[in-house]
Amino acid sequence: MKIWIDDEEEKDIDSSQELLEEEPEEDNSDRCIVHAIFFELAFGAVLYLKSATAAFSYLIALAPLVVSTGILGSICYKKNGDMKLFRAICCMSALGIGLQYLIDVKYSPVSEFSLIKFCISFLLSIIFLIFYGMIQKGLKYAFSVYLCMGISVSIYIVLYFFGYDPNGYGTNAWINIHGLTLQLTDFTKVCALFFYSSLFSCKYKENDTKVLLLSSIFFLLNLGGSLLIHELGSFFILFFLHLVMLFMFLPHSFKKVVYILSVFIACFMSVALSFILYKALLPSYQNGTMPSLISKIWPFIRKIYERFSITANINNDPYGAGYQLLQAKKSLWMAGFFGNTVNFNSLPVAESDMAFVAMVSQLGWITGFMYLYFLCRVTCLGLRYTRMRIVKYRDEAIVVFGATIMLFLQAILVILGSCNILPLTGLPI
């Protein structure tokens, strides 16, 4: 069964499907706003059972959270938005905010949850929505493709000179502005969304060779920037986003198949080459005879080897590269349905890479599966919205599709990595 979207197929969609875009669902009710607010309040009670301190901190954040849920929910309902999607996003937000306050109490995080940053991000999202119409119009012009490239390169340059790592892993993905820590690599992901939306909406979409060339240049720019700031975690999300966007929106052709397979093969060959080089260069590294030029790429080779070898056998280095994965394994085993009751809190970076493990450890597997349900719900509804809007609002649908896929990748790669299923979590180099 074909799941990609061809331009020829778009022209053949009948009028009944087009009418579906405009007709709201029968159960697309404003009751979803009430459900979301009730969940936010109920989760505060659950937090109180775990930690009164975390619950009172959550109570302070609950006021702007409930108000924003009501306001944004009303706007979404009046604009005939998907209220089920809105409800799922609100529930995930409440879980995330409450978890951060619980982590601040139970663990020793490098950085604590900031209500100020939460309010600033909320205001920025409002400003973004206000100007999104102008941005959307600009994406139809070819110059926006190069503008997104330039913005991404500028972000990497800023991080190279001014970036630092509050966790002490040696990456340069964060900057500090008057005491507020920002991870600028998140903005490169937003640029990627706009880049692909513009690429498949402007005049270049008619030329497959041009699309592959420009997308490859953008892909290599992100790879080079990620290596420059010693941070591959965000790049892996951009890597999968790159392949998914081309698979879905580039018309099916032999050239497309060859390109995607070539990228996959090159990726696997790079990992295999890293293993070979690690075995070959390890003696010279131990003897201190490694040439200076080779020593510059040695950290990359060693990190890739460590991540894959530790995933294969977590006990190879239990007090080094495998330490946080070993602690995560213990936390998951002791979590139970309702959370850890033996006070095991030796979990590194619980506020970032190990957030899902911390959620299961403190709140139990029931909450963990609830979060996974909301994540799948958001993903399915986002993809459904894309399918409904792709004919008449192509650029908007591409942005929604990209944001949905990127949110899913961001969450699932970290979750599977922290559970030692994928060797991708914690890949600073």
Where are these regions (language model features)?
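Hydrophobic, glycine- and aromatic-enriched re-entrant/interface helices and adjoining loop segments
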Residues: 258-367
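Membrane-helix boundary/helix-loop-helix interface segments in multi-pass membrane proteins
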Residues: 23-62, 69-230, 236, 415-429
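Alpha-helical transmembrane segments and their membrane-interface exit regions
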Residues: 65-72, 126-129, 241-250, 268
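Short, Lys/Arg-rich, polar N-terminal cytosolic tail immediately upstream
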Residues: 2-25
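Hydrophobic alpha-helical transmembrane segments
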Residues: 61-65, 119-127, 189, 361-382
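Hydrophobic alpha-helical segments of polytopic membrane proteins
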Residues: 208-227, 232-296
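Hydrophobic transmembrane alpha-helices and their immediate junctions
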Residues: 365-413
